[in-house]
């Protein structure tokens, strides 16, 4: 189960935290009376703790992203990752050569800017899901194309399947979230 919210990006960090807490409370109403704090792992992945005890809140995961005036969060009962991007013109072929597998770069060369963001948002969402960050997982990263050479709907990460789903966002943006799912080989 998950909850995905998209807002106009608030200017202040305190407002972003308030929106996140409201999304968490809407997802898990029994936490509405619990004082919560956000902490981060050494790699930067955020998680919730009880403000009173300092213990990690189990069974609730979240990921946030913002770009081009939008701010989004996903709250889930399992590990998840989210990336939201305003699709701005960029030197995407050079970025693809630097950060992507050769086959991903070839796909991007054919698919253009849209293709670049299809791979980039999956890569960022997966990096947030793993908690390792974009550069932290570089040696372990899977190719994000399927057998037909299109952006993957799911990839194998360690002993799990991670599924990618695009989120409906305004034109000119692309958002992808990922989560674990039971799948047969």
Q: Can you annotate each of these PLM segments?
A:
Residues 1-185:
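Core catalytic alpha/beta fold that binds nucleotide/phospho-ligands
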């Amino acid at each position: 189960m998950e909850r995905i919210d998209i807002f106009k990006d608030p200017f202040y960090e305190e407002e972003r935290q308030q929106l996140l807490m409201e999304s968490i409370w809407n997802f898990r109403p029994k936490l509405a009376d619990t004082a919560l704090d956000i902490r981060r792992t050494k790699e930067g992945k955020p998680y919730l703790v009880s403000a009173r005890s300092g213990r990690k809140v189990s069974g609730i995961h979240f990921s946030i992203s913002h770009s081009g005036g939008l701010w989004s969060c996903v709250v889930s009962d399992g590990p998840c990752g989210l990336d939201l991007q305003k699709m701005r013109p960029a030197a995407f072929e050079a970025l693809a050569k630097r950060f992507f597998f050769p086959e991903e770069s070839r796909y991007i060369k054919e698919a253009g800017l849209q293709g670049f963001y299809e791979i980039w948002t999956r890569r960022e969402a997966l990096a947030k899901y793993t908690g390792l960050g974009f550069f932290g997982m570089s040696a372990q990263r899977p190719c994000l194309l399927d057998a037909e050479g299109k952006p993957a709907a799911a990839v194998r990460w360690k002993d799990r399947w991670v599924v990618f789903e695009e989120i409906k966002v305004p034109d000119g943006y692309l958002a992808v979230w990922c989560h674990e799912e039971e799948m047969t080989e």
